[in-house]
Amino acid sequence: MTKFNQLQTKDDFAKLLGLKSAKYINYLLYNIKTDNLYNSFPIPKKNGGERVIHAPKKELKFLQKKLSNVLWECYLESIESKSKDKNFKTPVLSHAFEKGKSIITNSQMHRNKKYILNIDLKNFFDSFNFGRVRGFFIKDRDFAVSPEIATVIAQIACYQGKLPQGAPSSPIITNLITRILDYRIVKIAKKYRFTYSRYADDMTFSTNRELNSNKLRTSKELKNFLAELEEVIISSGFEINPKKTRLSNNMQRQ
């Protein structure tokens, strides 16, 4: 049981965030309205084009930081509790937005592997809409909050009905929601003897197995692997960006 499981009212939730009551939360949500508390601006993407960042203003950012902190505490508490169960192994799968993890630790998992497969999740942050965020906090057993409190969490975290890139609460919420996807993916990866990790929307798989029957045609087993991956990804509410799917061998990466 976590601190969230014990919440009864909005005031309980406010106190969990370190506030005296829900008065400040109600003021932002229903008087000012959170959609009026963002500054939006474009930043260039590494491979061309632009990404729009929605940065919360200080009043909302203050609240989102508090939400992020208590979600992290609950997340770590859940992992610690499960790690005590000998039948449960907590794999290190997500390397983005995780304390002690980075793009470097993500790449280290695939060092010296013969083949590396990269799969990109299309419009990653847009996949986390208001209903999905709200539903997660109602249904997930680590939280299991009332519909009223789940609605408040989603209102604090979402901008124009989605999790915004630029809000301090977005990273932890995306990692919480994608945990189930990661666990499903790692089962498929193990079945085909792949190592799997994820950095936000970038999934990486690697293996030392021989994947190509010849240089022009991909093996049937790899096709089956990709088909199973796609089925799980789509059923989990995400979409693959086919333009960014890439298979490379160690000779190509030199």
Indicate residue ranges for each PLM-predicted region.
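N-terminal, well-ordered alpha-helical segments
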Residues: 11, 41, 61, 65-69, ...
